[in-house]
């Protein structure tokens, strides 16, 4: 059980980090008005 919990926590942290990166990129793309930046 402990290993499974750790795995889920790590996965959640990774998803959270990815989500933040995506949000930052989207915000940056919207501010710059550059759709190509959002697609990267």
From Swiss-Prot:
This is Protein 4.1. It comes from Escherichia phage T7 (Bacteriophage T7).
């Amino acid at each position: 059980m402990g290993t499974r919990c750790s795995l889920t926590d790590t996965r959640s942290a990774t998803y959270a980090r990815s989500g933040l990166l995506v949000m930052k990129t989207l915000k940056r793309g919207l501010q710059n008005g550059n759709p190509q930046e959002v697609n990267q």
